[in-house]
Regions:
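Active-site substrate-recognition segment that forms the wall
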Residues: 11-135
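Short, ordered coil/turn segments that flank beta-strands lining enzyme active or ligand-binding pockets
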Residues: 3, 65, 152
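Core beta-strand elements of the Rossmann-like FAD/NAD(P) dinucleotide-binding domain
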Residues: 2-11
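Generic recognition of long tandem-repeat/solenoid scaffolds
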Residues: 1-2, 72, 139
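C-terminal catalytic lobe of FAD-dependent flavoproteins
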Residues: 101-179
Length: 179
């Protein structure tokens, strides 16, 4: 049910990121999923540019798609649906990035933001057919790399829904949670 009324269909995919568990409650399904907050920022450096990602222990620095900018990320915080940006946390990210790449100390902060990543209890995606509802499929819990893997996830889900794949990947199957 939406603000515009009911939406009909033959098959449904529950793929609503960090909000999937809330929607699943409407089906009397306890989806073992919670949001994990990630804070990050974008910096600008006029004299330095690179086109690859640098990974540190707790931080990464990635080139921004436009200009001489970098994205610095990111945190993993179990704070529910809190999407506030915390200046001290952003400062810590920048300090960690400067330990990896000292020229970051001269960078200007352009913007900062948060994202809520859907994490299943075992940190593995929940993808496949529901055993409770014959026309329901799950595609959620992709956590930190979900957006990067979207094309592969879509191909996998299409193969499941169309019956082109005989077996689900057991580590991703909703059956591991009796869904």
């Amino acid at each position: 049910v939406t603000e515009e009324g009911k939406v009909g269909g033959d098959q449904f995919v529950l793929a609503s990121g960090s909000w999937s568990a809330q929607l699943a409650k409407g089906l009397d399904v306890n989806l073992p999923l919670k949001p994990i907050k990630g804070q990050m920022c974008r910096l600008k450096l006029d004299d330095h540019f690179f086109d690859y990602t640098i990974h540190g222990m707790m931080t990464y620095i990635a080139p921004w798609k436009e200009g001489n900018g970098f994205v610095v990320g990111s945190t993993m915080e179990d704070k529910g649906f809190d999407s506030s940006i915390e200046g001290k946390v952003i400062d810590t990210l920048i300090e960690r990035a400067a330990e990896i790449l000292p020229c970051i100390k001269d960078a200007s902060l352009i913007e900062s933001w948060t994202g809520l990543r859907p994490a299943a209890n075992d940190l593995m995606p929940i993808m496949g057919k529901s055993w409770r509802y014959k026309n329901l499929f799950y595609s959620s819990g992709h956590y930190r790399n979900g957006i990067l893997q979207t094309p592969n996830q879509a191909d996998y889900m299409v193969s499941i829904i169309k019956g082109l794949r005989k077996n689900e990947i057991p580590e991703f199957s909703p059956s591991r949670y009796n869904l």
